[in-house]
């Protein structure tokens, strides 16, 4: 027989964990190398890199807070979709699908964390949906979560400004599916860096 008690235990803020992790990840051209490696591990045959310097419209978004990610961004697109194990692996810090899929080294897993050297809000599009990570919970996430996902079909109908930012890397306007994966890394601004618990340096795309 056990006596009722109350919950108590240690925890760690996700932002602080990420701050520690990115110290071991490359910056600059090393970030591109990580995505090249991930694309190769996923057996992609194409990788497109696009620098979108535009400030996009932010009037019709699934969450008004997403306006903070509508500025200049680096987009990386390959011609392989996420598998279900990939989607699960990318949600677990410090893991990759290599743990369960043998030779598929780092497939959209560990190497993805290098994104946080660039942005606090990495997002990606695959299998007819857009996913956005939000460790600070100030762009899209709602506690207790640290991110949000939306179906393309619903976005085009009600919040078209959000999927439109992926058009620079090949998403067709109005498309409810995409044959591949597009990552989008909006540059961390000076204002965002000043309040970030992950990295206090703005990211300048050269």
Task: Report the location of each language-model feature.
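Glycine/threonine-rich ATP-lid/beta-loop region of ATP-binding domains
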Residues: 171-206
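GHKL (Bergerat-fold) ATPase N-terminal catalytic module, capturing the glycine-rich phosphate-binding loop
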Residues: 1-176
